Amino acid sequence: MNQLDGIKQFTTVVADSGDIESIRHYQPQDATTNPSLLLKAAGLEQYGHLIEDAIAWGKKHGGTQEQQVAAASDKLAVNFGAEILKSIPGRVSTEVDARLSFDKEKSIEKARHLVGLYQQQGIDKSRILIKLAATWEGIRAAGQLEKEGINCNLTLLFSFAQARACAEAGVYLISPFVGRIYDWYQARSPLEPYVVEEDPGVKSVRNIYDYFKQHRYETIVMGASFRRTEQILALTGCDRLTISPNLLKELKEKEEPVIRKLVPSSQMFHRPTSMTEAEFRWEHNQDAMAVEKLSEGIRLFAVDQRKLEDLLAAKL
């Protein structure tokens, strides 16, 4: 049995890609997209029809060019998501514009709009996850959306405070980042020789997983942002793992046994009182890595969102 199939015995595998052909090839349960992945996929010739449809939608929407571009951009994200859903049995994650990361109300409005666009294509909200950055405002927005039956995936999650706040808000799923945490520490104090058990990104996800299971939080933990297969194998047993096509390929080509590493704890603890906004901001602020990586992640997604909009504007 190859390692990918071995992991699938213990963990739901999700494809971290906007490339529909790759998704079909690796047969994941779910798929995640973001502006960076959509920008990459939009440059591929085989997806030209999805872009043309989004452009036509933007023109039909009317208004200023800026409004038409915004309409086309939302439609493009949904077009990719709808196409991906034809190839997977589960859900696709579609991201809210990163520039709304500090605006609770506009994030809620955008999420409802994206769900509405999916519903116009006959796709039920039960097959969609709305991705939001795990800022305090994003977490509050997600808490409200969950009450409306719109499930959310909280991304750019680097600190334990972010994870705990998401669980306390009743968020459906979180995406703690492994690789970007590893990158930050590796740039400052390289882990040489590399020992996966000491990888700070792996340790972060393990701690979150254990805490959620011990306190009976139902929020799904989906490890994300991997740099090497060792990180993935060390988190086998995590609820879900979202993996890029190049690492899915590596795992599929290796015929080695896979051992479950994460197992729900039999120890149970009472849940603490929910964090206040001030407590969340203080705890998150204590983690220099998390503060830096969350800010950087939002900026990078915003840059790629603008590039995507420039690409669409040139065609309008």
Swiss-Prot record:
The protein's enzyme class: transferase
Pathway the protein takes part in: Carbohydrate degradation; pentose phosphate pathway; D-glyceraldehyde 3-phosphate and beta-D-fructose 6-phosphate from D-ribose 5-phosphate and D-xylulose 5-phosphate (non-oxidative stage): step 2/3
Record keywords: Cytoplasm, Pentose shunt, Schiff base, Transferase
Molecular function terms, GO-annotated: transaldolase activity
GO biological process: carbohydrate metabolic process; pentose-phosphate shunt
Segments passing through the bilayer: none
Functional description taken from the UniProt entry: Transaldolase is important for the balance of metabolites in the pentose-phosphate pathway.
Protein name per its UniProtKB record: Transaldolase 2
